[in-house]
């Protein structure tokens, strides 16, 4: 992977944009507007995955991205804000944020730190014995939880490494039938979040 240009944005810029982002199907609702948002380094064993798998090819991309960032003097696991990347072979810039973690109090009173975005990066941190810097969001509206439940056991050994996702595989356990109503639209205030990261080397 070749990074042609990096533009760094501060923690202040990151949080300001997060407060302005909207829901995917309701552009008038801003789930993070009044939440407590901070950058924190949180140990992997304090984070709850909702996604029950990681893709091997995506892990490879994350590792390539980490190495490419290191060549430019940046740490994938400690961005201290966010970066806008121009990648060789990719037409539009891509915004790379720290993983997004949302605090949620479940029905049984358990407080869980759900991984909203950045599962493959968090899993990479797990493999590399790193305590990653994450975006930690607390105080969300109760009616706007993350769209899937966290895995109750919080057991990272249960996460399956896949080449392809089988048709019958349960990727996540959704909270509601129309789960897209609970999607956050990161691209309402950022550029191409989740876009190409390493389709070329």
State where each predicted segment sits:
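Short alpha-helix boundary/capping and kink motifs at helix termini
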Residues: 1-7, 24-40, 44-114, 133
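A structured, charge-rich N-terminal accessory region that forms the first stable segment of a protein
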Residues: 12, 17-29
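Amphipathic alpha-helical interaction segments
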Residues: 17, 40, 44, 56, ...
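A sequence-level detector for short glycine-anchored, His/Arg-bearing signature motifs
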Residues: 109-128
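Short, low-complexity, polar/charged sequence segments that are solvent-exposed and flexible
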Residues: 119-123, 134-136, 153-156
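ADP-ribosyltransferase catalytic core
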Residues: 130-142
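Amphipathic, charge-rich alpha-helical segments that serve as recognition/docking helices
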Residues: 139-201
């Amino acid at each position: 992977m070749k990074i042609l240009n990096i533009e760094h944005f501060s923690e202040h810029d990151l949080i300001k944009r997060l407060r302005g982002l909207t829901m995917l199907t309701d552009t008038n609702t801003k789930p993070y507007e009044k939440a407590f948002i901070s950058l924190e380094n949180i140990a992997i064993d304090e984070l709850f995955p909702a996604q029950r798998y990681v893709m091997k090819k995506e892990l490879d991309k994350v590792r390539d991205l980490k190495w490419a960032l290191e060549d430019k003097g940046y740490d994938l696991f400690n961005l201290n804000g966010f970066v806008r990347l121009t990648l060789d072979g990719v037409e539009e810039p891509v915004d790379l944020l720290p993983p997004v973690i949302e605090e949620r109090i479940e029905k049984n009173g358990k407080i869980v730190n759900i991984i909203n975005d950045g599962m493959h990066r968090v899993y990479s941190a797990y493999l590399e014995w790193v305590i990653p810097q994450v975006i930690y969001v607390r105080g969300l509206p109760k009616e706007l939880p993350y769209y899937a439940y966290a895995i109750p056991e919080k057991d990272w050994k249960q996460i399956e490494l896949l080449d392809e996702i089988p048709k019958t595989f349960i990727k996540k356990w959704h909270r509601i039938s129309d789960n897209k109503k609970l999607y956050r639209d990161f691209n309402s205030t950022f550029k191409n979040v989740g876009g190409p990261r390493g389709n070329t080397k």
